[in-house]
Structure formats: structure tokens, C-alpha cells
């Protein structure tokens, strides 16, 4: 039996709970018990026979009780494995009729949570939506706030994945209302739940690139101190914060957030840690840091991870201003790097940075240099070279002018030198003034 199947609802543990429950006033029904365990023994080798056998448990029990509830859970699981989804839904709806009186509140909550977690592995979005909506409908009269919150959160995540933001906002409003005081303020006693809501809302604004709302919500989430959040939730919040800061050009803040997100994902065992490590590397390059991000104790074990290796090599080429190697790595590992839309969004900026560094080094010995020659050295079109030169001249990285008729860049080294001497002269005058002030005080 696979781990996933074992985890489905901790069958053995629950069997024990049922047999020896102190709350139960009835003696165990031996026929029911035998029928249940005989059915369970069939499910691996003959699942269809097991379904028929579990049906007999329901018939033997007559009135709704714990053994019928357990039999229905097994039938849901078997039908899921057989991809018999309509029958699975029918059995799930039948099981939900047991939660009001046939089994205890805690037991039903634990079981439904486990079922929802297991079904969440499905890629069939419509099936998941039906599951969550059916659960919420059944919970209207059950008054189980915890299960209602968890189910709504799962439905919200589904809408987020499907980019159905209108439906997601409706869910978020309901979730927020459940965590408010009578005055309509956030109930800080529900800090952990609030952080879950913020994480979901922050992901929505990140997907929509709504930085204004994202920034306010992100700051709000970091000020909740009453919660002991799950590291996965904090990983989501810090990752979205990193994306927000990077889009605003605040590379150092982005670097800090991505590093915190990576550590939280790593702690929770989430596969998002490798994605976030890629973002950390991206921020490291954009902030033009000479420090290798893989020198940190937390990141070092992932340096040679196949998922990360391309980014590791990219850092090396970037720090060495090796544009040929940089572009070669991008081409060779195109899917690994460029399939991520967030990385793709910022690769052009990295290319511009590395081309600028190579350009500065290339033109340094010259007073005049042909633009087609620069084009050849940088391996980009003449039009792209001109665009890069214009940007460098405007931000004073290069002192010069473009002669478009003759396709020349004319450099003014004297202007650059003059600016340096002006700064030195100003500094000397300030030192003289300081010296005179000290002498006057000592006199």
C-alpha cells in the first residue's frame, strides 16, 4: 500500500478509536465488524468485490452509525482510484448525511479533512469544485466553523489556480467576515486564520500585478504578531513580497524576502523552495551583488541540484561579465529558466545589465568607435546597440554622443575627467574649511 493511501484517513488508528471509544455505550456488533474487515481485505486485489462487500456493511447496519461511515469512506477511496467519479460523489454525499448525528463532531471533521486533502491531489478542477461546494452546502446546518474555514480556503485556492478572481473575491469576503470582531475590525485572536486569508489574497494581487493593494496587504500581514503561522503560509507571503519589491526595483528588499521565503518553504518541505531559490538568484544578480547566493549555509546544499544548476551557472557568467556564456546558458536551459513567467519577466533586464558592463569595458580605450563593431561584439542588432547607448548616455553611464549618419559613438573622456576633478576640488575645499574651523577652536 502506498504512503498516500495509508495517509488517506489513518485507517488503522481510526479502527482502534472505534473499537475502544469510551463515548460509545453500545457493544461492538461482531457481524458488522467482521464484514467491514473482510471488505477491507479485498480492496487491494479486487476493488469491485470490495465495493459490493462494503455495501453489505451499510445494509447490515441499517440505522446510520460509525461502521457505515467507515465503509463509505473506503468506498469513496476505491471509486477515486477507479476514476469512477460520479459514484464517488454519490457516496460522498451519502457520507455527509452521517455528520450530524451518526458520528462525533471531531471524528467527522478529521475524516472530511482527510478526504478533501486526498481528493485535492486530483487535477480535475470541476471535480474538486463540486467536492468543496458539496461540503460547504452540508456544513450550513452543521455549524462547524473550523471545517467551513478550511473548505472555503481550499475552494479559494482552486479559484486562484483557475484565475477566477471574481469568485475568489467573494470567498475572501466571507473568510474575512468570519475573522472580524463585532466592530468590523480584524480579530487578532484569530491571527493564524487571518494570515491564511492574507496569503490567499496576496497571491491574487500578485497574479493580477496589483502592487498598490498588494503592498498594503503585505505590510499588514507582517504586523500580525498574535499568530504562530505555518512556515508554508509565511513562505507564500514572503515570496509574494519579494515579487512585489522586485517589480518596484527594490532589489535588496526582494532579495531579503526571497531568502526568507526559501527558508520557510525549506522548513515546511515544500517543493516551492527550489523555485524561490531561483528568484533569490535573480534578485542577487539584479542588485549587482558580488556575493554568491549559494555561499549561505541554507542555500549551499542546493547548489548542484539539477533544478538549480542552470541558475548557478548563470550567476557565474553574470559576475564574470561573460555575455557569450550567459546567452549560451539561457539557450541551453531555455525551458528550465524561461518557462517561469516571473523569471522571464526580468531576464531582459539582466541581459541589459551584462551588456552594459561589457559595453563600458569595450569602449574604454576609444574616443570614437563604430556601432556595427559594438553590435558584433555584443551579438545584438545595431538598433538594440543604439537603444542601449541612448539609455547609457541618458543615465550618465557613458559620456558621449551618437553620430547616426556615420554609425559612430563619439566619446567625451574629458567631460568624464572634468567631472572627477570638479568633485575632487569640492572635496578639497570642504577639507580646508573643516581644518580652519578646528584651528579656530584650538586658538
Curated annotation (Swiss-Prot):
Essential component of the COP9 signalosome complex (CSN), a complex involved in various cellular and developmental processes. The CSN complex is an essential regulator of the ubiquitin (Ubl) conjugation pathway by mediating the deneddylation of the cullin subunits of E3 ligase complexes, leading to modify the Ubl ligase activity. Disulfide bonds: none annotated. The lineage of its organism: Eukaryota, Metazoa, Chordata, Craniata, Vertebrata. Component of the CSN complex, probably composed of cops1, cops2, cops3, cops4, cops5, cops6, cops7, cops8 and cops9. PANTHER family: 26S PROTEASOME NON-ATPASE REGULATORY SUBUNIT 11/COP9 SIGNALOSOME COMPLEX SUBUNIT 2 (PTHR10678). It comes from the Eukaryota. Residues 254-416 form the PCI domain. Keywords: Cytoplasm, Nucleus, Signalosome. GO terms for biological process: negative regulation of transcription by RNA polymerase II; protein deneddylation. Its main location: cytoplasm. It is found in: Cytoplasm; Nucleus. The keyword DNA damage does not apply. This is COP9 signalosome complex subunit 2. Coiled coil: none annotated. One of its GO terms (cellular component) is nucleus. Belongs to the CSN2 family. The gene is cops2.
